[in-house]
Amino acid sequence: MVYKYDFLIIGSGVAGMSYALKVARAHKGKVCMICKTSLDEANTSFAQGGVASVTNLEVDNFDKHIQDTMIAGDYISDYQAVKQVVTMAPEQIKALVQWGVNFDKQQDGKFDLHREGGHSEFRILHHADDTGAEIQRGLMEAVRNCPDIDIKENHFAVEIITQHHLGARVTRRTPYINCYGAYVLNPDTQKVDTYLSKVTVMCTGGCGAVYQTTTNPVIATGDGVDKIGRAVQQECRDRSRMPSSA
């Protein structure tokens, strides 16, 4: 079978579902999400502490948050990446709330902010001590109720489709790689289907399950990074920073 979409998202955690909702609600086209197990099985639901974001501007600001993050990372962190994540955090929190995620609030309606290790101010938004599960719940409900998002549960992305699969020769010296979608295994038919898309996004998370001792679910196998590596024929940048056995 051949399926055609505007957006193909491989992975069903907070990254994959957030991207799906953003493009679908902006009416940018038809979206398909590929989940290798069920939609609710992702590392997102295991996160407990909370989400850091500058919200109380009376005592906090972006510069403080950036500085705290750089210190916590022993100044190894990419400054521009840290700055982007910190400054965009309030907007992302607003989006999560609009999609139905509930964060704990005080009696006056303001967020009940906590402070965790490395933070100089109270800026941790949370939902009791199961913040990840609440984010996963809210996003799943929003995704399932969105008519422009098709969800393929228990489907496994086998390979990214590039010009190599169309007969072109691809090597490490090839200046760029075109992506046309992915080959996906359908467990019901035991056949590999073709999913063509204008945009393909890989949101498959870390590789904690390859270690003997880990708190990660068994699906965290890092196969998404492997698919990208095979497709582009290049070494992945910052592989040592990849989430692993936390």
What are these regions (language model features)?
Residues 2-5, 190-199:
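Core beta-strand elements of the Rossmann-like FAD/NAD(P) dinucleotide-binding domain
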Residues 7-33:
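N-terminal Rossmann-like FAD-binding beta1-loop-alpha1 element of flavoenzymes
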Residues 18, 22-23, 43, 200, ...:
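Hydrophobic/aromatic ligand-binding patch that stacks against planar heteroaromatic rings
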Residues 25-28, 52-53, 216-222:
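A glycine- and small-aliphatic-rich helix-loop capping segment at beta-alpha/alpha-beta transitions
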Residues 29-30, 35-180, 185-191, 209:
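Conserved N-terminal/central alpha/beta ligand/cofactor-binding core
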Residues 199-230, 234:
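Glycine-rich loop(s) and the adjacent beta-strand/alpha-helix scaffold that form part
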Residues 229-246:
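Positively charged, low-complexity/disordered segments
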